[in-house]
Amino acid sequence: MGIRMGRRLLLITLLLGALLCNNVAYAKFSRYSFPKDFIFGTGSAAYQYEGAYKEGGKGPSIWDTFTHIPGKILNNDTGDVANDFYHRYKEDVNLLKDMNMDAFRFSIAWTRILPNGSLSGGINREGVAFYNSLINDVIAKGMIPFVTIFHWDTPPGSGKQIRRLPERKHSNMHEKDYADFAEVCFHEFGDRVKYWTTFNEPFTYSAYGYGGGVFASGRCAPYVSKSCGAGDSSREPYLVTHHIHLSHAAVVHLYRTRYQPTQKGQIGMVVVTHWFVPYDDTAADRGAVQRSLDFMFGWFMDPLVHGDYPGTMRGWLGDRLPKFTPAQSAMVKGSYDFIGINYYTTYYAKSVPPPNSNELSYDVDSRANTTGFRNGKPIGPQFTPIFFNYPPGIREVLLYTKRRYNNPAIYITENGGNNSTVPEALRDGHRIEFHSKHLQFVNHAIRNGWGDGYLDRFGLIYVDRKTLTRYRKDSSYWIEDFLKKQY
């Protein structure tokens, strides 16, 4: 049986990011190699590209606060200006159309709509007007808007809730405020937006923001990092994720009951996963592969599909893993019309002994060590210190999802490889190879029954940080040629 499909989607995401070059000749491979109803597109996230962090009535988010702490971000970079999309979005939308894109995926900044984080603080009509103009421009250029409601930019006030966990049944994500924000989005934009995602990569938000402390909110246990002011890496990631599931399910219920019948849209969640292969061909390392998948992918997919967390997590975490009530389980189960999957890389997984019981954290709970190297050799070409080019992984993720999770409608919402040097940005043939090979393995998955969508995460466009001038890279011209329609 083939994977269940809605309208097919292939999103090739562009994070506006690095420079102009000549075309590179590759064997002919085009949109016509895919089903005719595939949609090809690009995308990014509000904090990463909008800028204008104090303009247009916008309030601060936890990322504004976090990046302004010296030393938290490499080179003390911030999103204060970013790519200045807020002022230059028409130019960028035109670039997307020039590349023959069919869709644009973007997120809505919570505090650009609700500057104080809650409905009681008032709706920022200037922010609503900005997104209305963006949506209208995307549609006017013949593209489809795909909108993410939450991409990590929580209002700072709601972050204080975590300090009272687990005594209070809240997380950093205040569920009512989030539901109010989502409803404003549905009400203001839902007549034109037909594809919604509630959360983008909640794994990253929970594990890195509350386990490792390297992302906002910057919380972790002192034995994980002395740079964290406070936190409990053994519990907070699981508590935050639990309330994300409840917030997601409540918003999906809201959309399905109040808006979907008339707006006729779809709604889902975007999750991220790596693929894993055994470090050694042993039963122990094959078990480490499954645990790695359960603790990253299953942490989100199992509740969405089955109504509870994976058995491995339940068995090993004990009371550190929150429990759903029967009513909550029923609400979370099936709370999606589609699943978005972000895939970047594959790692080896090796089984390791149980961790020190006095220094528990999300990072060690799976009892698996993951690495991109075996015997000193990388699993694939290394794009960044943590990302390796391993095209078969995208096929394996799709087919695993089909087998394990009852054949959901899937969109690959992010996939890609970054630059490490300026010359690579100027002549990015490696990215063309990345796209070409991953698309070939997507085709393999289609032949094995999958066929919903694909998206690339890293830059087809270079933005000069001093002048904010946009330059197209070789890969953008390859994509333009790949997507060219024959009339």
Curated annotation (Swiss-Prot):
The record's listing under InterPro entries reads:
Glyco_hydro_1, Glyco_hydro_1_N_CS, Glycoside_hydrolase_SF
Q: Does the keyword Disulfide bond apply?
A: yes
Enzyme class, spelled out: hydrolase
By its UniProt entry, which PROSITE patterns does this protein fall under? GLYCOSYL_HYDROL_F1_2 (PS00653)
Is the Hydrolase keyword given for this protein?
A: yes
Q: A single Gene Ontology molecular function, please?
A: beta-galactosidase activity
Q: Which reaction does it catalyse?
A: Hydrolysis of terminal, non-reducing beta-D-glucosyl residues with release of beta-D-glucose
Residues the record marks as carrying a glycan? 76, 116, 369, 418-419
- GO BP annotations listed: carbohydrate metabolic process
Q: For a beta-D-glucoside, which residues are the binding ones? A: 48, 151, 200-201, 344, 414, 458
Name of the protein = Putative beta-glucosidase 35
Gene that this sequence comes from: BGLU35
